[in-house]
From Swiss-Prot:
PANTHER family (alphabetical): HISTIDINE--TRNA LIGASE, MITOCHONDRIAL-RELATED, HISTIDYL-TRNA SYNTHETASE
Quaternary structure and partners: Homodimer.
Its EC number(s): 6.1.1.21
Family recorded in the similarity comment: Belongs to the class-II aminoacyl-tRNA synthetase family.
Catalysed reaction, written as an equation: tRNA(His) + L-histidine + ATP = L-histidyl-tRNA(His) + AMP + diphosphate + H(+)
Protein's gene: hisS
GO MF annotations in UniProt: ATP binding; histidine-tRNA ligase activity
GO terms for biological process, alphabetical: histidyl-tRNA aminoacylation
Cellular-component GO terms for this entry: cytoplasm
Subcellular location field: Cytoplasm
Name of the protein in its database record: Histidine--tRNA ligase
InterPro entries xrefs: aa-tRNA-synth_II (IPR006195), aa-tRNA-synth_II/BPL/LPL (IPR045864), Anticodon-bd (IPR004154), Anticodon-bd_dom_sf (IPR036621), His-tRNA-ligase (IPR015807), HisRS-like_core (IPR041715), HisRS/HisZ (IPR004516), HisRS_anticodon (IPR033656)
Lineage: superkingdom: Bacteria
Phylogenetic lineage: Bacteria, Pseudomonadati, Pseudomonadota, Betaproteobacteria, Burkholderiales
Length: 446
């Protein structure tokens, strides 16, 4: 009696942590190339920080009574040395930590950018994931409203470069610490009048972080939040001048905006300017980029008092918008797919593929899936499916004659017709392909 083979359980990914598959990676690469070009144009330098940081960095930097710290962080104790560690839920605190640790500001301000995965333990839904990706900028050592305006302008320029429309800018000022303290007293007094109707979340925040009550999504509390004392009415001359300076620069650059007095952001390190870029095309998760000024943070994390501002944007949400507006670029295929029939032809084809790559062409060499030689027909099907512009064909007869077959798979070859096979001397193959591709590109431009 034969023993029945035990079925091996199929493993799946963690919910809310998504694979980026080859058919989607092209869109990611398009976005990354676009944003990196923009960041270079503004003189920003790339910084890369670890995914795991000491938990204290976030409790001290973000704030202990924020949603992120209270219930969204992936934290654990390192079994090796007992350290409390956290997978980064955002990256501003880490960039600031790195700038202090490596004394990066000793010779003046820095413009930095980052890109990578962040992690938050929350219920996955459209536009909100447990592992998500952000690109962000941090302008360290710049105190004026011109720095705020510049980082906002960068976002507008990115939307234009990507072709995105309908993303609207909302701004507010959180003022200085003493202004927020005065407003906090009046806000708590106001909210206490409605203690019996506040939801559990608002009651929890009432005495710890009452500003966040203004940001409630509960429809039953909207009128209460709308009529609450406004922080902007508590701003002193310095804060007002900064906010008005920002507005003048935005207007001078034709950047429309709305002042939203309920815009407070969910991180404790902000002061003065805060802003969000929002859209109504993504349902509840309408914020695609957000940021502001965080002048106290560098000193709070052990550095010298230094002004700073920045933003972060959710890449998944922006890619969703690109798909929604049908702006995703077509996937580009390789330049050449090399097929072959016969052992001698296979060896010559392998050598030729490497020589073509030496010239900068993108080349796929047909490798056997099961170790057995594939038929010419099946190889040509693979060539067509690969998206290659040309198939280069090595057969025993061609090799004996010192020639190779070339077939245009996408556009016109030198003869002007797709799928017309031409015979080319091996030594002229590279020149022929380059000329044919130039001609095809020019035809596409017409």
């Amino acid at each position: 009696m034969t023993e029945q083979k035990r079925k091996i359980e199929k493993l799946t990914g963690v919910k809310g942590m998504n694979d980026i598959l080859p058919q989607d990676a092209g869109l990611w690469e398009f976005f990354e190339a676009t944003v990196k070009s923009l960041l270079r144009a503004y003189g920003y330098q790339n910084i890369r920080t670890p995914i795991v940081e000491h938990t204290q960095l976030f409790t001290r930097g973000i704030g202990e009574v924020t949603d992120i710290v209270e219930k969204e962080m992936y934290s654990f104790t390192d079994a090796l040395n007992g350290e409390n560690l956290t997978m980064r839920p955002e990256n501003t605190a880490a960039v600031v930590r790195a700038s202090i640790e490596h004394n990066m500001l000793y010779d003046g301000p820095k413009r930095l950018w980052y890109i990578g995965p962040m992690f938050r333990h929350e219920r996955p839904q459209r536009g909100r994931y447990r592992q998500f990706h952000q690109v962000g900028v941090e302008a360290l050592g710049f105190a004026g409203p011109d720095a705020d305006a510049e980082i906002i302008m960068m976002c507008q320029r990115l939307w234009d470069d990507l072709g995105l429309t309908g993303i609207k800018l909302e701004i507010n000022s959180l003022g200085l610490a003493e202004e927020r303290a005065a407003h906090r007293v009046e806000l708590i007094k106001y909210l206490e009048q409605f203690a019996d109707v506040l939801d559990e979340d608002a009651k929890r925040r009432l005495y710890t972080n009452p500003l966040r009550v203004l940001d409630t999504k509960n429809p039953a509390l909207q009128e209460i939040a709308q009529n609450a004392p406004k922080l902007i009415d508590f701003l002193g001359d310095e804060s007002r001048a900064h906010f008005e300076g920002l507005q003048r620069l935005l207007l001078a650059n034709n950047i429309p905006f709305k002042i939203n007095p309920r815009l407070v952001r969910g991180l404790d390190y902000y002061n003065l300017t805060v802003f969000e870029w929002v859209t109504d095309k993504l349902g509840a998760q309408g914020t695609v980029a957000a940021g502001g000024r965080y002048d106290p943070l560098i000193e709070q994390l052990g550095g010298k008092p230094t002004a700073a501002c920045g933003w972060a944007m959710g890449i998944e949400r922006i890619l969703e918008l690109l798909k929604e507006e049908d702006l995703a670029p077509e996937q580009e295929g390789v330049d050449v797919y090399v097929v072959h029939q016969g052992e001698t032809a296979r060896e010559q084809a392998f050598i030729a593929a490497e020589r073509l790559r030496d010239t900068g062409l993108d080349v796929i060499f047909h490798c056997s899936a099961d170790g057995a030689p594939a038929s010419f027909k099946s190889q040509m099907k693979r060539a067509d499916a690969s998206g290659a512009a040309f198939a280069v064909i090595f057969g025993e007869e061609e090799v004996a004659n010192g020639t190779v077959g070339v077939k245009a798979l996408r556009g016109a070859g030198e003869e002007g017709e797709k799928n017309v096979q031409q015979t080319v001397p091996v030594e002229s193959l590279t020149e022929f392909l380059i000329n044919a591709m130039v001609a095809s590109a020019e035809d596409g431009d017409d």
